[in-house]
From Swiss-Prot:
Protein name as it appears in the record: Protein Asterix
Compartment annotation: Membrane
UniProt record similarity statement: Belongs to the Asterix family.
PANTHER family, alphabetized: CGI-140, PAT COMPLEX SUBUNIT ASTERIX
Transmembrane recorded as keyword: yes
Record field: transmembrane: 32-52, 78-98
One example GO MF annotation: protein folding chaperone
Single GO cellular component term: endoplasmic reticulum membrane
GO biological process: protein insertion into ER membrane
Residue stretches in coiled coil: none
Keywords for the protein's UniProt record, in alphabetical order: Membrane, Transmembrane, Transmembrane helix
Amino acid sequence: MSDPRKESLIVERFEMRASTEPKEGELELYSLFSIIFGFLGIMLKYKICLWVSAVCCVAYLSNLKSKDSSVRTILSPVSLSLMGLVMAYFGPNSNLFV
């Protein structure tokens, strides 16, 4: 039996996979942006800053590894973004938020 394929036309292909690992400083940036936008949203009374803070917080929590987790590093951005959103929508001065 002869093989009908021509060896000169065979091209080996390697599957390229995108790395799903976050870069080294990416997690800290998500946490930092969450805290910064949370403070800006509370101090300047901007709801959009509070929502950006919440999105950065969710991105931070979704990429967090168990070895990186400590209570303080998790609780700071989460509490600040949630506190800002609660103040913006349910607080006594919620009409002042833009």
